[in-house]
Amino acid sequence: MTANARPNLIFIVADDLGFADLGCYGGREAAFGPVSPVLDGLAANGLKLTQGYSNSPVCSPTRFAMITGRWQYRLRGAADEPINSKSRGSSTLGLPPEHPTLPSLLKASGYRTALIGKWHLGYPPHFSPLKSGYDEFFGPMSGGVDYFSHCSSTGQHDLYVGEEEQQSEGYLTDLLSQRACEWVKRRNSDGSDQPFFLSLHYTAPHWPWETRDDAAIVDDVRANLFHLHGGNIHTYRRMI
């Protein structure tokens, strides 16, 4: 592939999103209007897939498959669900750094790579996005964090830049979007013709059930991050 034939790539992933809940796949409007107008617009002006199959539609196994292109259970870490904060320090529950990945192969081909969003493929010091092909990382290492405090289900703060914890205020979905926009703008203004690959992996609409208007319930959710009793279709739709 020639240098001028290498397009910039942005791979956007939602978490625990039912495909039929999007307007472009027949989802009904909410009381506040269309649930997914931006995604609907992308679908209307792009390519929409209508058939698919997932042999393990849960957090970490899905990500093992996406990043390696293999059946996830060929890798030891993908046999455990979930990989959570209790897995910190494990040298087996994660994506082996030596294994080829989509970002590592693109990086070897001259791409600048970044993951902004959820990783959930093992914890430092044995595993991290920076060890599996990404040049830069901003997001949580675990499967789900509070959207405001950015704490995991064990109460540990879980928001990183690279492999260092980062304190940032704001609703996580918005923080990820802002970081992604800033990253793309930097790539466009740095004077380099190096192509880029950006993985933008949102945690939304994964639990805990919090919209942008729910900052007041953070302390209640902290004691029960799964917060399953707080989920309803109205909150879910606003998180999309």
Can you describe what each PLM-predicted range is?
Residues 1-240:
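Formylglycine-dependent sulfatase
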